[in-house]
Amino acid sequence: MSLTIAIVGRPNVGKSTLFNRLVGQKLALVDDKPGVTRDRRIHAAKLQDLRFDVIDTAGLEEAGDHTLEGRMRSQTKAAIDEADLILFVFDAKSGITPSDLNFASLVRKSGKPIVLVANKSESKAATGGEYEAWSLGLGEPCPISAEHGLGLSDLRDAIIDAVGSERAFSNNKEEDMTIQPASVGDDIEDLQEEGLIYDESKPIRIAIAGRPNTGKSTLINSMLKQDRLLTGPEAGLTRDSISVDWEWRGRHIKLFDTAGLRRKSKIQEKLEKLSVADTLRAIRFAEVVVIVFDATMPFEKQDLQIADLVIREGRVPVIAFNKWDLIENSQATLIDLHEKCARFLPQVRGLRAVPLSGQYGQGIDKLMENIMMMHRVWNRRISTAKLNQWLEIVVAHHPPPAISGRRLKVKYITQVKTRPPGFMISCSRPKVMPQSYLRYLVNGLRETFDMSGIPVRLSLRASDNPFATRAKKK
């Protein structure tokens, strides 16, 4: 079983910087402003030959249990309960504060092994803070600089001393684990031959996106059946894109909770800009994006812009009408919402839209059934023979128009990629092909090969002119 380490401390001592250093990627948002991290985030990490899972946590603050800070503290306590070892981080440059003393007592009560980490020790002013740290009663401080990567060898040794060599290296006895940077943004080229088999062993990456306060984190907590993510009435609670592993009916899922996306004109703070960039990366890394609409006020301009972004990125869009428990005339409302989906988002015909209540856990199975169905379609490959049989029929039924007195000729079609399905048509004079005829072909592909509800790409290529080379030879 993998060693799990939680990074704990008051706000702005460098916990997220240390987390990013250990995982080898800039996953957690980092800013000079205190309280950037709100939810706990877990990821595979490596420190030289030592491998483990590390949890980044919200800064511990003294506040009532029902306040935002109090709920953040509950998330940190849950991380402490999950962990085998705690890295208690303090700011050596600033020295020990009353909050450090208070929270050191809380961490000691957990009974877990603790390594006291003196961060920002590259500063000349840090020596005094390291001496003060003995007052915490957590043993000898380990001086490091997470920002500059200093002292990490000593941190490795301190972790091994705290848990013992056998526990520290238990993961190495299992199959080697490689940590790779997340690939972001690019469509996945599929160069395999036809007849690609759908691989159910791979986890599906699902991002939960939407404007602020539509219930994204509440929905994920209902899926997991635990208070894994911070929720509340305040808009904009989520800042990082948090990934959580889940299993639904035997299928492995990786869920990404994202920060709410507002209109550009309202995004002013540097921290919110970082959150938005993190959300956009999560959308591009995902395969399926659940766009959460507030059913009591759906189809706001920002809802449609987020849906359009997901479609342009080529991901599988699925709309979740959340807060359905607040809707009175549910049947008539659902008919109206489906009609609006078709009217406001015509670029993806047959878009899946599911009513649900994240608060009460209603409609989640229906949502997941639609996700699984659309994910299969998104991965679909169609044989070239079937495509050209279809093309012959549709062109005979409705040939392309004549341009400047010359009829356009559509000759050949093949599928060049999946995820999303992409097709290339060989034709004469592709630059003058009307967009209306391209839409006719795309809609025909959707209908014939059952590809409704996902983006479909269609590109044109000029067919070879056999007389062009002869003319050049003359």
From Swiss-Prot:
Domain of life the protein comes from: Bacteria
Keyword GTP-binding found: yes
NCBIfam families tied to this protein: GTPase_EngA, small_GTP
Name of the protein in its database record: GTPase Der
GO MF, one annotated term: GTP binding
Keywords: GTP-binding, Nucleotide-binding, Repeat, Ribosome biogenesis
Pfam families named in the record: KH_dom-like (PF14714), MMR_HSR1 (PF01926)
InterPro entries in the record: G_ENGA, GTP-bd, GTPase_Der, KH_dom-like, KH_dom-like_a/b, P-loop_NTPase, Small_GTP-bd
Complexes and interactors: Associates with the 50S ribosomal subunit.
Residues reported in the UniProt entry to bind GTP 2: 210-217, 257-261, 322-325
Residue ranges constituting the EngA-type G domain according to the UniProt record: 3-167, 204-379
PANTHER family the record matches: GTPASE DER
Family designation: Belongs to the TRAFAC class TrmE-Era-EngA-EngB-Septin-like GTPase superfamily. EngA (Der) GTPase family.
Record-linked HAMAP family: GTPase_Der
Binding site for GTP 1: 9-16, 56-60, 119-122
Domain KH-like per the UniProt entry, residue ranges: 380-464
Disulfide bond sites: none
Membrane-spanning segments: none
GO annotation (BP), single: ribosome biogenesis
Biological role stated in the UniProt entry: GTPase that plays an essential role in the late steps of ribosome biogenesis.
